[in-house]
């Protein structure tokens, strides 16, 4: 990307899509091994969100020659979280409606979700569960990335 054309929105959306796809692949692998009913394992996918946000901030900082505004970093994290969790939420709605409607009952039986969980509330909760952590992860990550001495150059 050219120096002037790189925006935090473009970078955020790109990495948000990657993280969303990673969430879906992880869910499908869990299903393949019969682990999708262990809801607590789904929270391990937060590793993808952490990695995606850090990679997005690094890519943006590299494209801007090492300059990054603190609020741009926060916006990158929040946007990656929203985009990735929206992709996952859309996938879960399709999955529940087309492939396995009994999965919703498994979520309702979990202590992590209310018994009155509907497909719509699952959609909204999935987006919330990805958006808020995205902002918090970016807040923590920006403590490192905002420093002027933090560079992406390889050290010999």
Please place each PLM-identified region on the residue numbering.
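Alpha-helical transmembrane segments with an aromatic anchor "belt"
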Residues: 61-80
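Hydrophobic alpha-helical transmembrane segments
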Residues: 12-17, 44, 74, 78, 116-137, ...
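Functional transmembrane-helix hotspots
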Residues: 91-111
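Hydrophobic alpha-helical membrane-insertion segments
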Residues: 77-94
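Transmembrane alpha-helical insertion/packing segments
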Residues: 1-63
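Cytoplasmic juxtamembrane regions at transmembrane-helix boundaries
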Residues: 143-156
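Transmembrane alpha-helical segments of multi-pass membrane transport proteins and ion-pumping complexes
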Residues: 20-27, 85, 89, 130-142
């Amino acid at each position: 990307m050219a120096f002037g054309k790189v925006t935090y929105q473009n970078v955020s959306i790109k990495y948000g899509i990657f993280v969303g796809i990673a969430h879906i692949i992880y869910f499908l692998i869990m299903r393949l091994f019969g682990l999708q009913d262990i809801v607590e394992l789904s929270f391990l996918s937060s590793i993808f969100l952490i990695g995606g946000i850090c990679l997005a901030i690094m890519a943006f900082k590299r494209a801007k020659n090492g300059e990054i505004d603190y609020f741009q970093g926060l916006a990158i994290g929040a946007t990656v979280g929203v985009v990735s969790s929206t992709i996952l939420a859309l996938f879960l709605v399709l999955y529940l409606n087309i492939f396995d409607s009994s999965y919703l009952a498994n979520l309702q039986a979990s202590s992590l979700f209310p018994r009155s969980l509907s497909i719509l509330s699952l959609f909204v909760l999935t987006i919330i569960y990805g958006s808020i952590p995205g902002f918090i992860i970016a807040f923590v990550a920006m403590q490192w990335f905002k420093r002027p001495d933090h560079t992406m150059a390889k050290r010999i």
